[in-house]
Amino acid sequence: MRPGTGAERGGLMVSEMESQPPSRGPGDGERRLSGSNLCSSSWVSADGFLRRRPSMGHPGMHYAPMGMHPMGQRANMPPVPHGMMPQMMPPMGGPPMGQMPGMMSSVMSGMMMSHMSQASMQPALPPGVNSMDVAAGAASGAKSMWTEHKSPDGRTYYYNTETKQSTWEKPDDLKTPAEQLLSKCPWKEYKSDSGKPYYYNSQTKESRWAKPKELEDLEGYQNTIVAGGLITKSNLHAMIKAEESSKQEECTTASTAPVPTTEIPTTMSTMAAAEAAAAVVAAAAAAAAAANANTSTTPTNTVGSVPVAPEPEVTSIVATAVDNENTVTVSTEEQAQLANTTAIQDLSGDISSNTGEEPAKQETVSDFTPKKEEEESQPAKKTYTWNTKEEAKQAFKELLKEKRVPSNASWEQAMKMIINDPRYSALAKLSEKKQAFNAYKVQTEKEEKEEARSKYKEAKESFQRFLENHEKMTSTTRYKKAEQMFGEMEVWNAISERDRLEIYEDVLFFLSKKEKEQAKQLRKRNWEALKNILDNMANVTYSTTWSEAQQYLMDNPTFAEDEELQNMDKEDALICFEEHIRALEKEEEEEKQKTLLRERRRQRKNRESFQIFLDELHEHGQLHSMSSWMELYPTISSDIRFTNMLGQPGSTALDLFKFYVEDLKARYHDEKKIIKDILKDKGFVVEVNTTFEDFVAIISSTKRSTTLDAGNIKLAFNSLLEKAEAREREREKEEARKMKRKESAFKSMLKQATPPIELDAVWEDIRERFVKEPAFEDITLESERKRIFKDFMHVLEHECQHHHSKNKKHSKKSKKHHRKRSRSRSGSESDDDDSHSKKKRQRSESHSASERSSSAESERSYKKSKKHKKKSKKRRHKSDSPESDTEREKDKKEKDRDSEKDRSRQRSESKHKSPKKKTGKDSGNWDTSGSELSEGELEKRRRTLLEQLDDDQ
């Protein structure tokens, strides 16, 4: 082959191939025709043209087994339907290595395409069947080992009779070439839940609603193959004749080294081979037409546009097959070249990663044009005319550019390169030519500098990407170590040392940031993983220690299988464990709080139940304000609600009972008012002889008594009964006072009797003297009269005895006193004085004795009344416990009054003890003035006391 023909005839440029990313495999933009008769190096590009790989494999190298996905990858299988799960189909074996003769790819393609056109695109040959045998016709009727069957639910599955395996996916043996292309496409069509189709890329994990262009091209190519018949036999023979002239020159370009030859027997006729070749050309032309219909660019030598009809290539191959009808002798290198002529080439110009070689050029099938034909087809010399000087100058510059005159060339060097061209004479003057040449040099130098700058920039970017993506590069890698590793590589030496250092520093910063981010992500991932493991470990509690947790983690299979988790930072693991323990402690505390709340709720419900139990007792009349715990304990203790109260903190059952009774007592004043209103409405008055049953009968006769407490009713009854008793005592006191007044009047009557009553007098003897007296009539009972008379006689006798004793003492004193007196005084006068003094003493003594007796009686009566008051106060305090506050105030007032009364009584007694001396009467008469005064004072005092008692009540 001539150098440069691949770039000039529409093949893929080498620079374009190098600009493509090497990481892409044949699965991105192209699909292998596996299962067909094409060689393993044949590929169909996205635009439908048959292309070949530039690298030539060794005849003995191992090719990928036929029927397998390129690059050792299996085709993406659709989601397995529900129901029967078929076994996975293992990779199928390739053809035997002894069956790799150097057969021309054109004959193989012709046989394959002829079979496809005649059989209406039947499925490709099953894997394991040699394509050379099929081309020779030795196994033309070979039966596939896969059979098609129907499942009970109507779905189709496929069974392998040799491996005894079944699969839902259609095997490559039964697929047509178009179906194989579609199956190798990474884009698959699926249905959403709503039935709308969408497309998913199994390699990039991308999904979209619109149909990808790659899938559309493959479907268009499938339709082209199915349609068929685009090239007729006449067109095919015309192409064969046109190729015969260049047959010899093509053969010379195959290989210069002699290799062993192999004879291939032909079992097909020339017409069959021609028809097969026509089918191949038709398929390629239709695919190219479909690709050109999708693009708007014109056919050029770039990657985006490919020649529409590569007839010279195909016709030459077909002509070779027709001429060598009986036997064909081909060298080993030519076999390898022809095996690679039908390689599927992607529009991006990707190079197969299996070979690892970067060829210098990418040639298409059109590179087989003979050199002689190319020289003959060169155009003859033309004559140029220029209308203006600018056009002539532009033509001269184009000449320099076409001849690729460098920017540093001298004028003499440039003349040698362009002087033979007619456009050299475009400018007549030499100065104009030199001027145009200098302008061309400036422009070319500028363009070269710009191109060098862009290439250098691209080299720096490539170097930066190389360092960033290299697996051995880290943020701690030294520059010297990197120079040792990459110093011999072109990407390292493509830039200067200064720029290399700057880029290296930037790469280290980028890698450091990247590593930090990765470490952060790894730390976060390990944190989450450890947290999940701790959450799922039931034996880790809030009281678990770190050492115990470590042992639990080592026994955990999830932790033991995760190497990254085992390499986790110990401090991070400890912090994660600490947070987990804190969460468990918080949960435990919350659980305790919930338990405490539940316990408190239970205790509260127990208290409420016991309160309801007390209400029930109150409704039945068993519990009232006067009830005691000891009385009701047998009844209360027999209830379960009392048992539930035992042992719980807070208020006990006794406390609740006391509170309940106190509440009932607090209602006493209000209920007492209601009771008084009821008694007032009924006109009932509580007397001393009123019974509690009568009182309750009167109270319960109205509806207002339903809310009254039985204890409060009893307390009200006791209060009213005490008031009735107080009234009765007051009445008795009043009668006693009246009786005392009558007695004092009777005694006065006896004292004032004339003649005076003697000490030895008898009541029956003197009774008749007082019958008509009012004092005698006031006392109706004779027995009382006798009693008063006896008392009077007893007092009279006592006074007489006291008087005689005083007279004796007085006589002795008077004698002594009489001796001291003056003798001038007469004896008669002294006698009169003595008698007069004696009378006075007798009166004073009788008066003082009566006063003492009366004061003693009054004091005794006062003490009795005071004792009675104290007893009544005690009774009131015992019975009227709710009125304790008011009673205390009343007691204070009464005490104050009593103290005042005591003071007044003491003053009166002191007055009685020292009475004024009065002018007396005769000693023989009764002196009753002193006794009368004492009785009056006593009477006044009694009246004041009675008035005070009435006021208090």
UniProtKB/Swiss-Prot annotation:
Entry's Gene Ontology cellular component terms: nuclear matrix; nuclear speck; nucleus
InterPro entries, per database record: FF_domain, FF_domain_sf, Prp40-like, WW_dom, WW_dom_sf
Bias type Basic and acidic residues, positions: 879-912
Sequence positions bearing Omega-N-methylarginine: 9
Phosphothreonine carried by residues: 341, 369, 928
Swiss-Prot/TrEMBL GO biological process terms: cell migration; cytoskeleton organization; mRNA cis splicing, via spliceosome; regulation of cell shape; regulation of cytokinesis
GO molecular function: proline-rich region binding
Modified residues (N6-acetyllysine): 196
Pfam families xrefs: FF, FF_PRPF40A, WW
Segments forming domain FF: 389-443, 456-510, 523-583, 603-663, 668-723, 738-795
SUPFAM superfamilies: FF domain, WW domain
Domain WW: 140-173, 181-214
Covalent link location (Glycyl lysine isopeptide (Lys-Gly) (interchain with G-Cter in SUMO2)): 191, 241, 371-372
Modified sites of kind Phosphoserine: 34, 151, 719, 783, 879, 881, 884, 929, 931, 934
Gene3D superfamilies listed in its UniProt record: 2.20.70.10, FF domain
Subunit structure, as described in the record: Interacts with the N-terminus of HTT and with the phosphorylated C-terminal domain of POLR2A. Interacts with AKAP8L, SF1, SRPK1, ENAH, ATBF1 and MECP2. Interacts through the WW domains with formin proline-rich regions and with WASL/N-WASP.
Function: Binds to WASL/N-WASP and suppresses its translocation from the nucleus to the cytoplasm, thereby inhibiting its cytoplasmic function. Plays a role in the regulation of cell morphology and cytoskeletal organization. Required in the control of cell shape and migration. May play a role in cytokinesis. May be involved in pre-mRNA splicing.
Family the UniProt entry places it in: Belongs to the PRPF40 family.
Name of the featured protein: Pre-mRNA-processing factor 40 homolog A
Originating gene: Prpf40a
